[in-house]
Regions:
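Lectin-like carbohydrate-binding module/patch detector with strong preference for beta-trefoil
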Residues: 1-145
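Short Gly/aromatic-enriched secondary-structure transition segments
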Residues: 34-35, 195-207, 436-443
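Zn2+-dependent metallopeptidase catalytic core
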Residues: 145-318, 326, 343, 413, ...
Length: 514
């Protein structure tokens, strides 16, 4: 027997009749209940086809990240919604009784135990036999809606490193295999001495953590392959390091050109790589590690071709962790600095400690918006709410997961051609200087494509504006269960209430008015 999986279904049984429907408890336990029939998301069940004619059963309430399963406690009779996975308790067979109803069994407890309800408490359980509570009627309800696509933001002019569309004639596309070469140079005024190039590379890349972070944050869509040419040793640039000023485009380009000239095409062909990392000794007069972007024909020269995308690693990379390089590579993919150039950097960034592009000292992930902008977040995991709604409910799943709705986007200005939006997602834990992870709850922020890099294009709306030496600025920004975020942006207001936590997911109510 097959079902139309494009619809959601109501499940009622013969014992309790059509006035009671299978539902989910709202207490965070993920347990089931029989509740008075109504238009509730916990009573909208989705059937997801699996192999052998079996189905996973999920609700609109908790979404695709939670599937009907059985608690493995020895008795194995209690159904609940568990994190979706390849588990035998989530493979359900719907067998016709011959009277228009169905028996629901699963692979874990076998064909002898069917979904039933107790005669006294009416709680669902699994039992043997042929009882009226095991005769389930599936009534088709609404067609399952898709997520509304999130539009690109319109910068409204020439905005450098905008949160709007990325110009891939200028930046690297963050997908597929992106190849990078790392070379090492020193200077008459800053010799490398006995510094190991190989050990330096290990530190800069975090012994492979930088590459792994990009692979995980992109859900496997980006593979950053770094070829470390420590075997070529430290090559001496003729000019002193003080002759270069990396904050100036022409001087920055000259430095990369002079460094690349030290390597013959037979040693390394820079044209084979999309990105180039040029490493200087700690003693060089480069306090920072800026990214270099150039349009075709305006890049640095090399014996084997033009270099348009590079990171020149300075002394801060020796004291900072590998996130420093991850941040700079983010610029090569078109992501902006979220902290203000006129402020104190990460210490007072309006995006707080919640993004690698804001705080390299505590953040270990990219915002959901940047995952979306980079094309990493699947379209089904983000949705756009363009119209006013006094009560819109959703269960948000962690961005680090592989399923579920993870990003809500709401326009602040023109809903059809927005330049500024509100974003709602689950906070991704930061790493404290004490080595401990911190941060859970719901994060709310604005994204403005008309604001350039270094001018706070992302602003977190915090529960509490506080700072910690261990966890960073705005470390108490996320909202927890029972807490309410409220903001007014121009003519738009958003009130977001965190209703409940289910595992690592949060159920929220959105009141959006424009």
């Amino acid at each position: 027997m097959s079902f139309d999986t494009s619809f959601s279904y109501r499940l009622t049984n013969r014992f309790l009749g059509p006035g009671q429907s299978l539902d989910v408890r709202s207490d965070g336990s993920c347990r089931l209940k029989m509740a008075p029939t109504g238009d509730y998301s916990g009573q909208h069940w989705r059937l997801v086809a699996r192999s052998g004619g079996r189905y996973a059963l999920q609700t609109s309430y908790l979404g695709e990240c939670f599937s009907l399963d059985v608690i493995n406690d020895g008795t194995n009779t209690t159904p609940w919604l568990a994190v979706t996975g390849n588990y035998s308790g989530q493979y359900w067979t719907l067998t016709p009784w011959g009277d228009g109803t169905y028996r629901l069994t699963n692979d874990f407890t076998g064909p002898q135990r069917s979904l039933d309800t107790y005669s006294d408490t009416h709680d669902p359980f699994l039992d043997t036999g042929d009882h009226s509570g095991q005769h389930w009627t599936l009534t088709a309800l609404d067609r399952i809606p898709g997520t509304a696509p999130v539009p690109e933001l319109e910068p409204g002019g020439d905005v450098y490193k905008t949160e709007g569309p990325t110009d891939f004639s200028f930046y690297a596309r963050p997908s597929g295999v992106v190849k990078a070469a790392m070379v090492f140079v020193d200077f008459p005024d800053a010799p490398a001495g006995s510094t190991s190039a190989a050990a330096t590379a290990d530190h800069l890349l975090g012994n492979g953590q930088a590459q792994r972070l990009y692979r995980e944050q992109s859900y496997g869509q980006l593979s950053l392959e770094v070829t470390v040419r420590s075997d070529l040793g430290w090559r001496r640039v003729p000019k002193p390091s003080t002759s270069y000023h990396l904050s100036q485009f022409e001087s920055h380009r000259s430095y990369i050109t002079d460094a690349a000239a030290l390597f013959q095409p037979t040693e390394i062909a820079f044209s084979d790589y999309q990105l180039v990392f040029v490493v200087a000794p700690r003693a060089a007069s480069f306090p920072l590690s800026p990214a270099f972007n150039a349009r075709p024909g305006q890049g640095a020269g090399s014996p084997s071709g033009e270099i348009r995308l590079a990171v020149t690693l300075g002394s801060d990379s020796y004291t900072n962790r590998y996130i420093n390089l991850v941040h700079e590579v983010g610029h090569l993919f078109g992501l902006p600095d979220l902290y203000s150039y006129t402020g104190s950097g990460a210490a007072d960034s309006k995006a707080g400690c919640w993004s690698i592009m804001s705080d390299i000292f505590h953040a270990v992930s990219f915002l959901g918006w940047h995952r979306h902008k980079n094309g990493w977040l699947p379209a089904s995991r983000a949705t756009y709410i363009a119209d006013s709604t006094p009560a819109w409910y959703a269960t948000l799943s962690p961005l680090s997961g592989s399923c579920g709705l993870s990003l809500l986007v709401l326009p602040v200005d023109d809903p059809h051609h927005p330049s500024k939006v509100l974003a709602v997602e689950l906070a991704q834990p930061v790493l404290g200087s004490n080595g401990r992870s911190w941060g859970e709850g719901v994060l709310v922020y604005t994204v403005d494509a008309t604001i350039a890099t270094g001018s706070s294009p992302v602003v977190v709306i915090p529960k509490r504006a506080s700072s910690s030496p261990d966890y960073g600025y705005l470390y108490e920004a996320p909202f927890g269960v029972g807490e309410v975020a409220h903001t007014v942006q121009g003519s738009v207001s958003l009130t977001m209430t965190v209703l409940q936590k289910f595992g690592s997911s949060y159920n929220v109510k959105v009141d959006y008015r424009r």
